[in-house]
Amino acid sequence: MKKPFPFSAIVGQEQMKQAMVLTAIDPGIGGVLVFGDRGTGKSTAVRALAALLPLIKAVEGCPVNSARPEDCPEWAHVSSTTMIERPTPVVDLPLGVTEDRVVGALDIERALTRGEKAFEPGLLARANRGYLYIDEVNLLEDHIVDLLLDVAQSGENVVEREGLSIRHPARFVLVGSGNPEEGELRPQLLDRFGLSVEVRSPRDVETRVEVITRRDAYDADHDAFMEKWGAEDMQLRGRILGARAALPQLKTPNTVLHDCAALCIALGSDGLRGELTLLRAARAQAAFEGAEAVGRSHLRSVATMALSHRLRRDPLDEAGSVSRVERCVAEVLP
């Protein structure tokens, strides 16, 4: 079976790749929303990043990929204490999915054949410690998106139905993609995503030719292509793991907190999610760059992806949300 396309070999789309790397460093940033044209590497980037990350150690047979035997939920009835290594999970959420399929439900077959009340885990269980990818998230039913965002934020899935009361860990990075021409997300849901980026098809011939060349090389001689880009992927993996380890020791000056608040006030963003996400993303960026403390340069680097989707629409301002954030950053964080 072919390995996913190397993350380092993806041409362009730097902001999308940056957002995904930051969530790999600190999943607490929240999900990533990627809006833009079809065929711009959105799903490719998710699978490539997950493949780039180290294998996870999990209990054999555990439906929620528990890292320790004692963490396996009771309802799973896992007797094995054998630890195995498996790739970071990437779970696709289909558009017509039901709530039962997402969160889990009563195992009807066991109930009918054995008369036992057992829990059949859903997609959230499989996605634990990995990625949950939703293509065309703007076409998914609002209550499903709301449910996913709730679980992604809490890190726990709670199921109360048909006489069952089940809890299990569900810590994953939610990545949603979509085409804005096919419909938009409600502002309440937009605000729940940590980062948001816009992607566009390349407009210059050289970039498009490079995309075609790399994809053709990947399909023609998969092993040689993977070997060519393997060193860069391993280097990126090392930087991500180093940034994860450095996060707890990273210093955050009070001036940075002041800058976060001042920027969000200037933009008129509602609530405090903007400041919190901006700070988390800036800390991850600083750790990725090997800095000892968060600075204004890190805030400037992540401001558009952390704040552009949280702005109120201004009918008197024809500029897009990204342009408004960039303009405000230039004024508040010179």
UniProtKB/Swiss-Prot annotation:
Record flagged with keyword ATP-binding: yes
Pfam families hit by this protein: AAA_lid_2 (PF17863), Mg_chelatase (PF01078)
SUPFAM superfamilies: P-loop containing nucleoside triphosphate hydrolases
Keyword Iron: no
Keywords: ATP-binding, Bacteriochlorophyll biosynthesis, Chlorophyll biosynthesis, Ligase, Nucleotide-binding, Photosynthesis
Reaction(s) this enzyme catalyzes, per UniProt: protoporphyrin IX + Mg(2+) + ATP + H2O = Mg-protoporphyrin IX + ADP + phosphate + 3 H(+)
Superkingdom classification of source: Bacteria
GO biological process: bacteriochlorophyll biosynthetic process; photosynthesis
Protein name in UniProt: Magnesium-chelatase 38 kDa subunit
